[in-house]
């Protein structure tokens, strides 16, 4: 059995720990922070807003929040991180000062009206480019009034931005989403003293009566990162894998459940349950069968590109529907998956809210073909999840990816661990 402690701290928790520290009044400690480019953007902005950040150990920090958030004298650069931009928008909407949030070309092309509209419901003064559709965003912090909002999309980033504004508004606010998205924001903030309740799918958020409690968080491993290696195991004959110290929040393991339905053997062993469930995941290769994915999309949307690789190895036609938001990620992930598959000669087709893939079941003829002719270069579209998904496919096919370095955005250790997995599977471990 291959045993991996993937050493990829959870991206969602890392972002939130930094951003939430700014609503505390005492030093906070974040351990096992994800040192990927996205999370470092959140950390740098915290410093630009007046927080003092000190290294305490490897990948660990003491964050001393400012007494009041400082108005920066420069643009707050979110780089490629949508989480950074959207959550800081909620936080800063009620803070005194003028704040400008911008990012790289990819982030500035991603939809921002989805957060501007709920924040404006509070009375927030926030503007975006092209009639509020895109960043850069300009925020003039101002007093907020409670509101009641029903989101047309299930998005943890939209929900989190709303909650951060609601905590600073006058009066209790409510938020309803179309389906449950990841709930780390609610869990973490409640543990720090925020009054947040979920009743029949409606969140009620009361304003903070005092600063958040200081905290000492140790970040568990990211299930979205771990999933790439569950996929690697599922498509590699005779392989068995133990993934250690993984966050097992039910809103984060839907992709593992889908892979399990496809035929892979997957079991969980909970090791601790404090703030969040943490444990180990056992994965064993088994023949895969096709699947249709059209529910619980919000809980697995980040893993759909990786699941598309599993579909390639499955018997039958697999389908993804109700996943239009894939087109609004770091790349148009529907087009990215389908265009790469078509370049490889795979039968597939895209539609507005998804795609289908005709599984090969036996991939050896394609492997033989690419031993005779040079395979096409896989296009990452500078999207970390597209790059890593197709990198897993290189375990079975002799492919090259145009920019695997973009994995550093969320998973700096990915290439090293993929090589470890490859050596382990070749050695029969």
From Swiss-Prot:
- Give the molecular function GO annotations: 3-phosphoshikimate 1-carboxyvinyltransferase activity
Looking up PROSITE patterns in the UniProt record yields: EPSP_SYNTHASE_1 (PS00104), EPSP_SYNTHASE_2 (PS00885)
Chief site of localization: cytoplasm
> What biological-process GO terms show up in the record?
amino acid biosynthetic process; aromatic amino acid family biosynthetic process; chorismate biosynthetic process
Which residues make up the binding site for phosphoenolpyruvate? Answer: 11, 82, 110, 157, 333, 385
One of the record's GO cellular component terms: cytoplasm
Q: What top-level branch of life does the organism fall under?
A: Bacteria
User: Keywords assigned by UniProt?
Assistant: Amino-acid biosynthesis, Aromatic amino acid biosynthesis, Cytoplasm, Transferase
SUPFAM superfamilies of this UniProt entry?
EPT/RTPC-like
Q: Which reaction does it catalyse?
A: 3-phosphoshikimate + phosphoenolpyruvate = 5-O-(1-carboxyvinyl)-3-phosphoshikimate + phosphate
E.C. no: 2.5.1.19
The UniProt record gives the binding positions of 3-phosphoshikimate as 11-12, 16, 155, 157, 302, 329
Pathway this chain belongs to: Metabolic intermediate biosynthesis; chorismate biosynthesis; chorismate from D-erythrose 4-phosphate and phosphoenolpyruvate: step 6/7
Q: How does this chain assemble?
A: Monomer.
> In which family does this protein belong, per the annotation?
Belongs to the EPSP synthase family.
What is the protein's known function?
Catalyzes the transfer of the enolpyruvyl moiety of phosphoenolpyruvate (PEP) to the 5-hydroxyl of shikimate-3-phosphate (S3P) to produce enolpyruvyl shikimate-3-phosphate and inorganic phosphate.
Stated name of the protein: 3-phosphoshikimate 1-carboxyvinyltransferase
The beginning of the lineage is: Bacteria, Pseudomonadati, Campylobacterota, Epsilonproteobacteria, Campylobacterales
